[in-house]
């Protein structure tokens, strides 16, 4: 394989923009499947990439299946990513291993809330992208509007590479502005590409749009700029070089268009992927050297260097755990010995395969830059595998904290065993899915990113693991904090025969207003009134006290603690004595520091026909929502608001019924905010009643 020609790409989009349909067409044109199936298939087959039973039924892509195709002797690994906010960890994970992406947009709806989330993730991982404006055959299609929205809403330098020949039901092809030719897609499934001269009625528009394209590209190539300014013809290769340079520098987003469903424009998009998106050689990747204070190391696409690979996705296959791996340096071969840098355990590579949606192809070897899968390796998602001669770790992926929890109870003994297996599997697969047993209620609690996220796992428990479970009401992950400053001076003393316990801790607590930090410990002890070896004990005690607040039993956050005095006893003082003194000191001051309750606030985006805008405002106002923005775009409206998570349970059902099923919403965690006094009293009462019972 020529690794200069390799492309690792993701297809990212808002839900229902036609992303899986586009992938399906790509598989078809690259001869990976022999018939095209629709997403919510009338033929009962479902799209090839949606291999989980649940995905085919719901018509949403949940797990990002990886597939390998070849287009005009360019090998391409495609990661199909989910478009639903509740599954963003899948998206984040895929982006971590990609070199380039196609951002799919609906030509009517344009840039939607999830497109914004996905774009933010693409920016976080510096992924170059092309835009594909899909569904140009839909009523109300306006690719020019979408191109403008890419600029206004996503701040992308979007430049048209094509213009449509006809829109809505008259959409029959596209004009390539670089080659100045018209392309039509004919024959069964659009396999015959017919190149013709541009229709006379579109020639003027094509010339104008080409001028605009060349103006935009002049920034990326001096030769192009000179020729263009002198009014000379610019060679095609120079135009292609400028587009590639701008795209790789993340300063240009080339815009292509068509209709995947109607088989228009997909092959030209594939040409663009090979021409303008990066090969692994074009991207800089780094690892941390764990033997050298996590020093950053540049990795090189070189088969002769020691192997470094990242496990980015786990799945249960029929032959055990299937681990998807991106090779960043060196090679993977059957029988090769590697080490997992997180666990320091050595293992041998067994079966090595290339994936096509859910079919496998055995291979002997994977080279630098490639994406392959391994069978039967024990690991967690995000682990780094490397040659035993080095100890590198790929920088860890950003993992958001869960915002919702749910109690799950197995219906019988068999279900209990199966549920335990399922939970073990899911927590390894998905770092945003967490589980624990509540000590007081003895219930198993699962936590995740939203109702749909947890709902899918409960369904999977039933289907894949035959675990019948009952679920409780969803619970919000509240937090407690303080709003004032309070002093403490606490002595812990215990004498009960033998060695006693003694420790005194004094100081104060105050609110911590530091972005991204929830606790700070400051040691101002002088003169050894608390010996140095017991300072960490105090720190540990304070952190222990913060695990469970006294208001409603949730963790305490955003506190700065300063200790400035204390006392010890030469015999009775110990690590545990100072831990307990700190816990007592914390509780003494906490009551005086005006504690309050915080709740997760979500950024909620509603989108639907303008006729329902009033209903959308009403629904948000009823839920303590603060409207932060609204946009009317002809017949289409979008409303953005900040709404407490506790008010959003069951919202999808309410929204459907009040907008005739025509509006949709997405939400993601934004911040924690103080609860109003009425809610504060309600939560306190509920907590106290539970404690009494």
Swiss-Prot record:
Q: Report which gene this protein is encoded by.
A: fusA1
GO molecular function list: GTP binding; GTPase activity; translation elongation factor activity
Which species is listed as the source? Borreliella afzelii (strain PKo)
**What is the protein named?**
Elongation factor G 1
Q: Which UniProt keywords apply?
A: Cytoplasm, Elongation factor, GTP-binding, Nucleotide-binding, Protein biosynthesis
The top of its lineage is:
Bacteria, Pseudomonadati, Spirochaetota, Spirochaetia, Spirochaetales
Cross-referenced NCBIfam families = EF-G (TIGR00484), PRK12740.1-5 (NF009381), small_GTP (TIGR00231)
A Pfam family found in this protein is GTP_EFTU
Which SMART domains does the UniProt entry name for this protein? EFG_C (SM00838), EFG_IV (SM00889)
UniProt keyword annotation of Plastid present: no
